[in-house]
Amino acid sequence: MVDQNPKRSGEPPVWLMFGAGGTVSAIFFPVVILIIGLLLPFGLVDAHNLITFAYSWIGKLVILVLTIFPMWCGLHRIHHGMHDLKVHVPAGGFIFYGLATIYTVWVLFAVINL
């Protein structure tokens, strides 16, 4: 028999942010490491061009994506990792996802004011 009143969960939006963070980390961080870690120090990329890009609207969007989504992914992993290790933090979801939300708002204000 199918339950006619299923219990709703707040997890889907969190899983969306978690999945986006993992995908962003896997796809874009190698490129960021290449640019900032190798090309910039060896003078193959001009720092002025990177700064100009960061001040453009698409650059601000890239900064937002590269900072917000991986933080959600990391805090989600920590929250569930602690749960798997039987370390049950009282109101853990509220704490970890609250920290991710505060970080998101902070980054939004910081990047918008660039």
Swiss-Prot record:
The lineage of its organism: Bacteria, Pseudomonadati, Pseudomonadota, Gammaproteobacteria, Pasteurellales. The chain crosses the membrane at residues 24-44, 50-70, 92-112. SUPFAM superfamilies: Fumarate reductase respiratory complex transmembrane subunits. GO terms for cellular component: fumarate reductase complex; plasma membrane. The keyword Chaperone does not apply. GO terms for molecular function: succinate dehydrogenase activity. Part of an enzyme complex containing four subunits: a flavoprotein (FrdA), an iron-sulfur protein (FrdB), and two hydrophobic anchor proteins (FrdC and FrdD). GO terms for biological process: fumarate metabolic process. The keyword DNA-binding does not apply. It is found in: Cell inner membrane. It comes from Haemophilus influenzae (strain PittEE). Anchors the catalytic components of the fumarate reductase complex to the cell membrane, binds quinones. Pfam families: Fumarate_red_D (PF02313). Keywords: Cell inner membrane, Cell membrane, Membrane, Transmembrane, Transmembrane helix. This is Fumarate reductase subunit D. Belongs to the FrdD family. It is a multi-pass membrane protein.
